[in-house]
Curated annotation (Swiss-Prot):
Pfam families: Tim17. Essential core component of the TIM22 complex, a complex that mediates the import and insertion of multi-pass transmembrane proteins into the mitochondrial inner membrane. In the TIM22 complex, it constitutes the voltage-activated and signal-gated channel. Forms a twin-pore translocase that uses the membrane potential as external driving force in 2 voltage-dependent steps. InterPro entries: TIM22. Component of the TIM22 complex, whose core is composed of TIM22 and TIM54, associated with the 70 kDa heterohexamer composed of TIM9 and TIM10 (or TIM8 and TIM13). It is a multi-pass membrane protein. Belongs to the Tim17/Tim22/Tim23 family. GO terms for cellular component: TIM22 mitochondrial import inner membrane insertion complex. GO terms for biological process: protein insertion into mitochondrial inner membrane. It is found in: Mitochondrion inner membrane. GO terms for molecular function: mitochondrion targeting sequence binding; protein transmembrane transporter activity; structural molecule activity. This is Mitochondrial import inner membrane translocase subunit TIM22. Disulfide bonds join 42-127, 146-165. The chain crosses the membrane at residues 47-67, 138-154, 159-179.
């Protein structure tokens, strides 16, 4: 028999009710807890980073692809591409626009895939490293950058993997140092009169 007096019943966690037994407010709270729990997990962070990277990469790829058409189509391109450019200029305007939008879509999708892939891998590796080390410091990002950069370049050989590791680690360190630069103590003269 459990003693119920002097507030001792509040020492144990409340009994977990089935979802159907909860009030609408409690169902909303439980749903929000589940969403926050997923977003805080390593797979959740990885999926969110991948989706965000995909969206950002698509916008950036679309912008960069639109810059490829900043010269008139009849202008000769160095390297002997003037024949292909002249053929493009001979097409009707509607066909030219259709081809340009198709090319922009392909470039935007390619950029979106690359950014999404990099974001997903980096976030997953950083979260896993942080979970293994049980620390939140700059070395998690450096390690994740090295693993991500080396992993992306491993098919090109060990030298490329080493350069990718060093490059991603240095970039990650620079970004982390910038982002955490405001976490330090305020300057000595900040609060003096």
């Amino acid at each position: 028999m459990v003693y119920r007096g002097f507030g001792l019943e509040y020492l144990s966690p409340p009994e977990k009710k089935a979802f159907g037994e909860l009030s609408p407010d409690e169902q909303g709270e439980r749903g929000a807890e589940m969403v926050v729990g997923f977003m805080s997990s390593c797979p959740g962070k990885s999926v969110i980073s991948g989706a965000t990277g995909f969206a950002l990469g698509g916008v950036l790829g679309l912008f960069m692809a639109s810059m490829a058409y900043d010269t008139p189509l009849h202008t000769p391109v160095p390297g002997g591409m003037s024949g292909a450019v002249q053929q493009m200029a001979d097409l009707p305007l509607r066909q030219q626009v259709k081809l340009q939008f198709a090319d922009m879509g392909k470039r935007a999708y390619s950029s979106a895939k690359n950014f999404g892939y990099i974001g997903m891998i980096y976030a997953g590796v950083e979260c896993a490293v942080e979970s293994l080390r049980a620390k939140n410091d700059i070395y998690n990002g450096i390690t994740a950058g090295c693993i991500t950069g080396g992993g992306l370049a491993y098919k090109s050989g060990p030298q490329a993997a080493l350069v990718g590791c060093a490059g991603f680690a240095a970039f990650s360190a620079a970004i982390d140092m910038y982002m955490k630069s405001e976490d330090g103590r305020p300057p000595e003269n900040d609060f003096k009169q």
